[in-house]
């Protein structure tokens, strides 16, 4: 019987700078930059205290919270800016049998000041009104290179385009939408493999 889970951490807060993460007083990430992920770590089920500090410091945490880890799961813990402060969003990967002839992808919106978004793949509307902190359903796509566009919902205004979103068959991906609409960089997408693709229990 599986008695553990996997978790990785993502710094998705544009304003926090590099961070150190402590779980139950033990440092699990050092100088985790904005847009960076840790590797997956094994973790036992239970409640944990999770504290975030500016990198290199151990006083005045940016955030202190609790997380409940359930056995037999694969988590991404995303540190996000919610518009008034910072918080964690815990995202569970769905374990599934992966068809080797298809790629699976979902969209996760972590930008607090982005508008509602419509998602287009190869100029086909695949998701409407994606809101902040929403985790979209999985889409099944042909492997290969795809054109990704994010548009302001119900409009023709493109606010991000990635013409080279490359997906492999038999793999599952999450597309994390991060960034601050108010700065010059704007929105960005991170497209890592999900742990369900390669982790074993």
Predicted regions and their residues:
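Intrinsically disordered, low-complexity polar regions and short flexible loop motifs
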Residues: 1-201
């Amino acid at each position: 019987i599986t008695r553990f889970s996997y978790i990785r951490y993502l710094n998705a807060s544009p304003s926090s700078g590099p961070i150190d993460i402590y779980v139950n007083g033990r440092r699990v990430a050092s100088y985790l930059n904005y847009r960076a992920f840790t590797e997956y770590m094994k973790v036992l089920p239970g409640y944990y205290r999770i504290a975030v500090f500016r990198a290199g410091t151990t006083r005045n945490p940016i955030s202190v919270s609790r997380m409940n880890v359930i056995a037999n799961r694969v988590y991404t813990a995303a540190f996000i800016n919610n518009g008034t402060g910072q918080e964690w969003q815990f995202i569970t990967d769905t374990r599934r049998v992966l068809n080797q002839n298809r790629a699976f992808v979902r969209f996760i919106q972590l930008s607090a000041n982005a508008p509602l978004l419509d998602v287009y793949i190869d100029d086909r509307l695949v998701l409407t009104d994606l809101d902040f902190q929403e985790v979209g359903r999985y889409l099944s796509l042909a492997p290969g290179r795809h054109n990704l566009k994010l548009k302001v919902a119900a409009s023709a205004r493109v606010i991000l385009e990635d013409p080279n979103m490359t997906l492999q068959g038999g793999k599952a991906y999450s597309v994390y939408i991060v960034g601050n609409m108010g700065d010059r960089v704007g929105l960005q997408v991170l497209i890592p493999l999900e742990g369900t693709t390669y982790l074993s229990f």
